[in-house]
Curated annotation (Swiss-Prot):
Its EC number is 1.1.1.38. The keyword Thylakoid does not apply. GO terms for molecular function: malate dehydrogenase (decarboxylating) (NAD+) activity; metal ion binding; NAD binding; oxaloacetate decarboxylase activity. The gene is maeA. GO terms for cellular component: cytosol. It comes from Pseudomonas savastanoi pv. phaseolicola (strain 1448A / Race 6) (Pseudomonas syringae pv. phaseolicola (strain 1448A / Race 6)). The record marks 267 as: Important for activity. HAMAP family: NAD_malic_enz. This is NAD-dependent malic enzyme. The keyword NAD applies. Divalent metal cations. Prefers magnesium or manganese. A divalent metal cation binds at residues 243-244, 267. Belongs to the malic enzymes family. Pfam families: malic, Malic_M.
Length: 563
């Protein structure tokens, strides 16, 4: 699968070469390479192809007793031979994506200190804040193009996981490579260890992180600033992805730094982009416009509000005014519908609160603010999106009421992991007589209903962020803008089988994700050029750059270079 036959000249040899995951070939080193690099006797005599290696490791993988065991096994391959790891993923992506990322990665984060095997990435702790430059210099990779960083305060729907959150940057970057073709040589996972408020971790004798309550306020902000400044000195052109920061920090950090460097928050912007892409695909399939939809959210955190703002931006592109668009978005939290005058609303929530006058005539219960069923009923909802992290919030009554207003409602229970999902696809389809369009955050098996098989689209950020990263790297964009994200959403929608006429799923199958990433990369890069954020070239040149940067897992020939 390699795209070049040129040999790679390296100076490493013997056991040290076998201990380098980016260069190790294991049993695939050729007889000539074994002599040239002092490997005779360090490997079994038989020389294998990468296909034979994949067969062996897949057989071993199938013997693992649990999903967590499978995750640990795959990570051990990654830490030994990255090329083999990604070739294995390429052969079994549908099967292994839920293992290397959601939902299994959540358990891996919870058990991080117990299952820890070897180092990967950088751990930057608050007590070592004066040595961040030294820590970044210790990274063994010099040409980093994408960093995923977390402070682990909001890991999936599991909350504060301390340094265990490292599993998320590792998993995300694995998807940048498997889905978006970014070479693992150009990626770096980082955890910012600012302590933890998770008492279970603090009391755990095996916990490997800084045993201290979380730093907050000005101390936290100053630490983040030190980190950002150090990253810009070390890798000034890097794409920095913020991952799983708490909502109180996620949006402020994005707003503060998005105009200073090429950065991206996948929880806010990636989730929003894939959700809007899914919504656009559903609208295209039903011959409707986005502006015709009434969208109800359950969960008004940074992710939900980020999706809502992205939908509003898309509605405005269709021609609605901002006020018209905002009237079609309804945010429900644990207290009810976000309404102006509500206490303790964050700034990004206030923008999405409904005006009291607009809902004063609603028929509702006795609570101070309209509840979910009230909102679905009075708003005439056509789309229901769950980002609450609360199992079972989409009740049968709510879904049936939604179906009254819309023959084919779009229902998107996006919470991860599966134990946190607002309703299962089987429940949603049963309660709508098989008429709902369903996209979920976690993977679900197809559903049999009314004599047909319904394939469930996984509204997974892996459809979006690898393509965005590939586009940014290919065109060397200096920033990531809302219009670039909208370009990604539109490109994803155009790939929907419902739009292309190749199936009934809202999103394309994962086996096509590399082609989807290429299309998204082109759309993102063209928009970056249009905004003056990348050097303008022809579309042909962009396509060539995308292919040039798309790494495929295969072994190159090695030649010895003297030190």
């Amino acid at each position: 699968m390699t795209k070049t036959s040129r040999p790679l000249y390296i100076s490493y040899a013997g056991p040290s070469l076998l201990e380098m995951p980016l260069l190790n070939k294991g049993s695939a080193f050729t007889p000539q390479e074994r002599v040239e690099f002092n490997l005779i006797g360090l490997l079994p005599q038989n020389v294998e192809t990468i296909e034979e290696q994949v067969t062996r490791v897949y057989s071993q993988y199938k013997q693992c007793a649990s999903d967590l065991d499978k995750h640990i096994y795959l990570r051990s391959i990654q830490d030994n031979n990255e090329t083999l790891f990604f070739r294995l993923l390429d052969s079994h992506l549908d099967e292994m994506l839920p293992i290397i990322y959601t939902p299994t990665v959540g358990q891996a984060c919870q058990e991080f200190s117990k299952i820890y095997r070897t180092h990967r990435g950088l751990f930057i702790s608050y007590p070592e804040r004066d040595r961040i430059d030294d820590i970044l210099r210790s990274a063994t990779k010099d040409r980093i193009k994408i960093i995923v960083v977390t402070d682990s305060e909001r890991i999936l729907g599991l909350g504060d996981q301390g340094i265990g959150g490292m599993g998320i940057p590792i998993g995300k970057l694995s998807l940048y490579t498997a889905c978006g073709g970014i070479s693992p040589a150009y990626t770096l996972p980082i955890v910012l260890d600012v302590g933890t408020n998770n008492r279970e971790l603090l009391d755990d004798p095996m916990y490997m992180g800084w045993r201290h309550e979380r730093v907050s306020g000005k101390e936290y902000e100053d630490f983040i600033a030190l980190f950002i400044d150090a990253v810009q000195r070390r890798w000034p052109d890097v794409l920095l992805q913020f991952e799983d920061f708490a909502q109180s920090n996620a949006m402020p950090l994005l707003e503060k730094y998005r105009d200073e460097l090429c950065c991206f928050n996948d929880d806010i912007q990636g989730t929003a982009s894939v959700a809007v892409g899914t919504l656009l695909a559903a609208c295209k399939a039903k011959n409707e416009t986005l502006g015709q939809q009434k969208v109800v959210f359950v969960g008004a955190g940074s992710a939900g509000c980020g999706i809502a703002e992205h939908i509003i931006a898309a509605m405005r592109i269709e021609g609605l005014s901002e006020s018209e668009a905002r009237k079609r978005i309804f945010m429900v939290d644990r207290f009810g519908l976000l309404t102006e005058g509500m206490d303790n609303l964050l700034d990004f929530q206030k923008r999405l609160a409904q005006k009291t006058a607009d809902v004063s005539g609603w028929t509702a219960g006795t609570e101070a603010f309209p509840q979910l069923l009230d909102v679905v009923t009075n708003a005439g909802a056509t789309v229901l999106i769950g980002v609450s992290g609360q199992r079972g919030l989409f009740t049968e009554q709510v879904i049936r009421e939604l179906h009254k207003h819309c023959a084919k409602p779009l229902v998107m229970p996006l919470s991860n992991p599966t134990s946190k999902v607002e309703a299962t696809p089987e429940e949603i389809l049963r309660w709508t007589d098989g008429n709902a369009l369903v996209a979920t955050g976690s993977p679900f098996a197809p559903v049999e209903i009314n004599g047909r098989t319904v394939h469930i689209a996984q509204c997974n950020n892996s459809y979006i962020f690898p393509g965005i990263g590939l586009g940014v790297v290919a065109c060397k964009a200096s920033r990531i803008t809302d219009r670039m994200l909208m370009a990604a959403s539109n490109a994803l929608a155009e790939c929907s089988p419902m739009v292309t006429g190749q199936g009934d799923a809202v999103l394309p199958p994962l086996k096509e994700i590399q082609q989807v990433s290429r299309k998204i990369a082109l759309a993102v890069a063209k928009e970056a050029q249009a905004e003056g954020l990348a050097l303008e070239t022809s579309e042909e040149a962009l396509l060539e750059a995308i292919e040039r940067n798309f790494w495929l897992p295969g072994y190159r020939a090695y030649r010895r270079r003297s030190v």
